[in-house]
Amino acid sequence: MLSPKRTRFRKQHRGRMKGISYRGNRICFGKYALQALEPAWITSRQIEAGRRAMTRNVRRGGKIWVRIFPDKPVTVRPTETRMGSGKGSPEYWVAVVKPGRILYEMGGVAENIARKAISIAASKMPIRTQFIISG
């Protein structure tokens, strides 16, 4: 699972996801990519599940790049706890994804193989996505 080695602060505000992604919205490394169409928090488990699904499908053929990193801690309070007494403890990590952001890239394989592998990874994501080709 992906997570930062160390952060400056243990806890963060939730924030809000306005607008579209201006950074990380172009294909940089591979030829094919999976692009987000909706805003969401994507957990490190979901990122890893998508990466594993793609790797298993492509076998040794191509190369895969994960273009998002979960750097936001999400805190959860223990169950049946009364209100107050501070914020909960960090439970898992999420990547904040806005529409237009590239999630995964792939290269070194035929288009039909890439399309199949990326569609399997897309089914692991909690948002609508699209398959795009560079060029």
From Swiss-Prot:
Highest taxon, organism lineage: Eukaryota
Q: Does the keyword Ribosomal protein apply?
A: yes
- Gene3D superfamilies documented for this protein: Ribosomal protein L10e/L16
Alphabetical UniProt keywords: Chloroplast, Plastid, Ribonucleoprotein, Ribosomal protein
Q: Where in the cell is it found?
A: Plastid, Chloroplast
**Some GO term, biological process aspect, for this entry: which one?**
mitochondrial translation
Q: Which residues are the signal sequence here?
A: none
- Name of a matching Pfam family: Ribosomal_L16
List the InterPro entries: Ribosomal_uL16 (IPR047873), Ribosomal_uL16_bact-type (IPR000114), Ribosomal_uL16_CS (IPR020798), Ribosomal_uL16_dom (IPR016180), Ribosomal_uL16_sf (IPR036920)
Q: Which GO terms describe its molecular function?
A: rRNA binding; structural constituent of ribosome
What GO cellular-component annotations does this UniProt entry give?
Answer: chloroplast; mitochondrial large ribosomal subunit
Question: Does the record carry DNA damage as a key word?
Answer: no
Q: How does it assemble?
A: Part of the 50S ribosomal subunit.
Task: Extract the PANTHER family matched here.
Answer: 50S/60S RIBOSOMAL PROTEIN L16 (PTHR12220), LARGE RIBOSOMAL SUBUNIT PROTEIN UL16M (PTHR12220:SF13)
Family membership:
Belongs to the universal ribosomal protein uL16 family.
The entry's protein name is Large ribosomal subunit protein uL16c
